[in-house]
């Protein structure tokens, strides 16, 4: 499937997302925090009015960047969330947090959503003892995700956990051992999800186009 693999620094600056929020980048060296304005010659001085549509579109684009989604995937998850009981925006984020690649990132077993997806696709991980190699695999609360013993010892896996273990892990995820895997404890509350988006805007964006 086609995927946007452009420079994340530019994408983050354009959307105002600190690069350190989606990768292992040191916040002190984060280009978005050092230059909190869009890229380009006039990024720091440009003055433009922003329409309601542009605000909604921006929030949707931020969500896609946080989770590494294509438009078709993002719309499909929204449609599922809109059919579920509860607040659509919160349910949308809960569904995305329940993805296998998202949980691997939240547990600090990977340095970015791209690397988490790579670990999954290469078959490094098992969910409740069964191999899972689809990044969008929906993990159920109470399930355990573990590296296969041989893969857990790989240098890239060990290095990723070493770089990320100083980061805080949300309460709905429990790290098993020294980077052996994770337990998905429960569905997260909205305030626990480390994603800075205005989800009502995202709901409005898709609702107007359904």
Curated annotation (Swiss-Prot):
Record keywords: Ribonucleoprotein, Ribosomal protein, RNA-binding, rRNA-binding
Segments of this protein annotated with the region Disordered: 22-49
GO cellular component terms attached to this protein's record: small ribosomal subunit
Boundaries of every S4 RNA-binding domain copy: 98-161
SMART domains for the chain: Ribosomal_S4 (SM01390), S4 (SM00363)
BP-aspect Gene Ontology terms: ribosomal small subunit biogenesis; translation
InterPro entries: Ribosomal_uS4, Ribosomal_uS4_bac-type, Ribosomal_uS4_CS, Ribosomal_uS4_N, S4_RNA-bd, S4_RNA-bd_sf
Ranges of compositional bias, category Basic and acidic residues: 23-33
Pfam families from the UniProt entry: Ribosomal_S4, S4
Molecular functions per Gene Ontology: rRNA binding; structural constituent of ribosome
Top-level lineage group: Bacteria
Record-stated family: Belongs to the universal ribosomal protein uS4 family.
Physiological role: One of the primary rRNA binding proteins, it binds directly to 16S rRNA where it nucleates assembly of the body of the 30S subunit. With S5 and S12 plays an important role in translational accuracy.
UniProt xrefs under PANTHER family: 30S 40S RIBOSOMAL PROTEIN, SMALL RIBOSOMAL SUBUNIT PROTEIN US4M
NCBIfam families the UniProt entry points to: PRK05327.1, rpsD_bact
Assembly information from the UniProt record: Part of the 30S ribosomal subunit. Contacts protein S5. The interaction surface between S4 and S5 is involved in control of translational fidelity.
Entry-linked HAMAP family: Ribosomal_uS4_B
The protein's name in its UniProt record: Small ribosomal subunit protein uS4B
Species the sequence originates in: Myxococcus xanthus (strain DK1622)
